[in-house]
Swiss-Prot record:
Residues binding Cu(2+): 47, 137, 270
Cellular compartments annotated: Membrane
Protein name: Inactive AA13 family lytic polysaccharide monooxygenase
Residues annotated as domain Chitin-binding type-4: 47-276
UniProt superkingdom: Eukaryota
Length: 279
């Protein structure tokens, strides 16, 4: 009698072990896997937006609408080494925040109805963006102005949301209206330490962050070497990144300046824009 009972016990024990394995698998899938996924997602996300002049993104946060102004991300895309290869899609030249479902390509009562700053044609102006402490993935950045008012006007009408095709046409116009680093006399315009001569990123009309693995003042925060919280980000505090650009000999009572940051480490691009006048 002992042998059959022993065999039955072994069968039941094997089934018990299988049940425990299934239960533990379900616990992992339901509890630990999402936490791991969230942790990984948080660790690889880059974050930043235009700060000066006050971008629509900044105004969205200051109005209490945008909970994460640094989170308007175009992803996943090829952001490196070709800086202009990725289509902008719904992000357009002004950015789209999926977290709060905000499309900054369309004006509202909180942004886009008026110019936030007025400049003169050909003026050299200070521009600044804000990079999050936990989201600094290096790379290169630039500022652009589209000089086709008929294109820009589609982004100044609060009753109209530009289509993706119109957003891409605008992005192409902004790319053509790049404001080169080299146009400002005396400004340092180096090449990215993370780019190799011959690659598409080997250019100094764009601005570059410091080397991603630099031992001194690395990545984008190393450009100003400013204190943490020198600008606002919702995740871990921000650092300013400040440069100068020379405006074109062009006039408009209401136009846009667009900021674009291509991340080196991740396949992400950040876009934001500010409403300005050039008179």
């Amino acid at each position: 009698m002992s042998a059959p009972c022993s065999g039955m016990f072994q069968v039941r024990w094997r089934w018990y072990n299988k049940d425990v394995d299934r239960i533990l698998s379900h616990v992992y899938i339901m509890v630990f896997a999402p936490l791991l996924s969230l942790s990984l997602a948080t660790s690889v996300a880059g974050h930043g937006y235009m700060y000066i002049p006050s971008s629509r993104t900044r105004l969205g946060h200051e109005a209490g609408i945008d909970s994460c102004p640094e989170c308007a991300i175009l992803e996943p895309v090829s952001s490196w080494p070709d800086l202009d290869a990725a289509p902008v899609g719904r992000s357009g030249p002004c950015g789209y925040n999926a977290r709060d479902s905000i499309d900054y390509n369309q004006p509202t009562t909180n942004w886009g109805s008026d110019a936030v700053q007025s400049y003169s044609p050909g003026e050299e102006i200070e521009v600044q963006w804000c990079v999050d402490h936990n989201g600094d993935h290096g790379g290169m950045f630039t500022y652009r102005i589209c000089q086709d008012q008929s294109i820009v006007d589609k982004f100044l009408d609060p009753s109209y949301l530009p289509t993706n095709d119109e957003k891409q046409a605008a992005e192409d116009c902004f790319d053509a209206g790049l404001l080169p680093c080299t146009d400002v006399s005396g400004q340092e315009c180096g090449y990215s330490a993370d780019c190799t001569e011959g690659e598409a990123c080997w250019r100094n009309d764009w601005f570059t962050c410091n080397g991603f693995e630099a031992s001194d003042r690395p990545k984008c925060q190393g450009v100003d070497n400013a204190e943490l919280n020198s600008c606002y980000t919702s995740i871990a505090g921000g650092y300013t990144v400040t440069k100068k650009v020379k405006l074109p000999e062009y006039t408009s009572n209401h136009t846009l300046i667009s900021f674009k940051w291509n991340s080196f480490q991740t396949g992400q691009i950040y876009l934001s824009c500010a409403d300005i006048a050039i008179q």
